[in-house]
Amino acid sequence: MAGSEEQWPRRREDGDPDAAAAPLQDAELALAGINMLLNNGFRESDQLFKQYRNHSPLMSFGASFVSFLNAMMTFEEEKMQLACDDLKTTEKLCESEEAGVIETIKNKIKKNVDARKSTPSMVDRLQRQIIIADCQVYLAVLSFVKQELSAYIKGGWILRKAWKIYSKCYVDINALQELYQKKLTEEPLASDAANDNHVVAEGVTEESLSRLKGAVSFGYGLFHLCISMVPPNLLKIINLLGFPGDRLQGLSSLTYASESKDMKAPLATLALLWYHTVVRPFFALDGSDNKGGLDEAKAILLRKESAYPNSSLFMFFKGRIQRLECQINSALTSFHTALELAVDQREIQHVCLYEIGWCSMIELNFKDAFDSFERLKNESRWSQCYYAYLTAVCQGATGDVDGAQLVFKEVQKLFKRKNNQIEQFSVKKAERFRKQTPTRALCVLASIEVLYLWKALPNCSFPNLQRMSQACHEVDDSSVVGLKHLLLGAIHKCLGNSQDALQFFQRAARDELCRQSNSYVPPYACYELGCLLLDSAETVGRGRTLLLQAKEDFSGYDFENRLHVRIHAALASLRELVPQ
């Protein structure tokens, strides 16, 4: 497909009378390339974009995006550097062709110039500005991956620049759409012929404006959505950079982008699926409602089913929905199918393997979980330290404690990302079992612990939750009493036993020993207590006080930022119900 030039548009010269149509044909070509990528044609998509890289700024961006995606899925240094170089090349191409702005002005002055000729330069100018902002966002992401202070600062300022471009383009395109509609519905006055706005609108089509609105709405919506989840302790920095954070605006913009004919429409669809099936449950954005967002996600999959019949990514999200609905066997089937569909896409296979490992842990099938995590430990470049910890925990939970201890000893050696909270947690937890042989009971407890921290307990069936409760009660170790009570509280909460959950959370919050060995237990227990008390009108005030206490009275514990996002979401939902 990629090799057949006849089916794609040739490069238009400026003097070509059909040049005004070129941007839309570029958009169709770029959209076809992205759709190809999502239907498991990663190589074909890469070849297509490379073949037409010099065809237009849009195709150059498509090639750079595929390069960026490849870098983010592998985390290989050389691929990340190549992606940076490609994105900068695309950015320079767009900036160099900004002569279109001057050309527009010249066309306005020259009365004998065909009015249509000003149109592509204006449409192109907006397109190039959006591409520049997109490139800057991806460059910032590549910078953040380095996890160095200077990289964070640099990335922050790059994002600030990108946001200003998105914001201006969004306003400009909305204004043009309004002007276009006005032009269609009103009889133009003679004086309008001399009006700049009339000249700008001349020749602009509804289709081109709609596509441009879709193009800018992807980045504009992502900014709003991501910033809306930032906890208060980071909001000062965010506000300093001038970023907004309106969740509803973000979702609305991404939905518009997903239904547009822009090349990023499929990416906006994936972003919405990611938000509804991963972000919302993980950060508890819907409070105790563990199925929030599932109806929206299912509706998206239903609408897009015919366009992506064999997409490993869409099959992956189908599995996510099934997992959140506690249909673990169905979820496992979907993840295994996605794994097979992604035969040439190692990174997508790894994402599927990760979910298979988690679903197996949810089912307390530690042998299958061990197989998945061990393969990830050996194959993935993302976080071998974390995968080694999960491998050891599951191996010990099967009863092979000697083999588990050998893997626990590997965790420290694989610790590379010093500022990564997940790796810090993995090393800290593995340290104890590196020095002394773990017991099967403690490894099972450790597996329940990660299920709790990753918000996976609500995905467990009642029989499995009861088995987990029994496993916690069987642990007789004074150093993990606080942790045991926290987990028992979470299990009883999922079982609907609110009073039992309340008592266990209170015990966990009071446990002094866990402040040294499991420092996150008291603030998390405090948060859980607060959330439980929010469910009753009589105890809402006490619940809010506990949430604020969890936020303000503790610091320096594992997954602090993660908890702050959840507290922020709980307080925000409370403000919606009871305005302060």
Curated annotation (Swiss-Prot):
Stored InterPro entries: Iml2/TPR_39, TPR-like_helical_dom_sf
Which segments carry the TPR repeats?
Answer: 312-345, 350-383, 482-515
Keywords annotated in UniProt: Repeat, TPR repeat
The record, for PANTHER family, names: TETRATRICOPEPTIDE REPEAT PROTEIN 39 FAMILY MEMBER (PTHR31859), TETRATRICOPEPTIDE REPEAT PROTEIN 39C (PTHR31859:SF1)
What family name appears in the similarity comment?
Belongs to the TTC39 family.
The name on file for this protein is Tetratricopeptide repeat protein 39C
Q: Which organism is it from?
A: Mus musculus
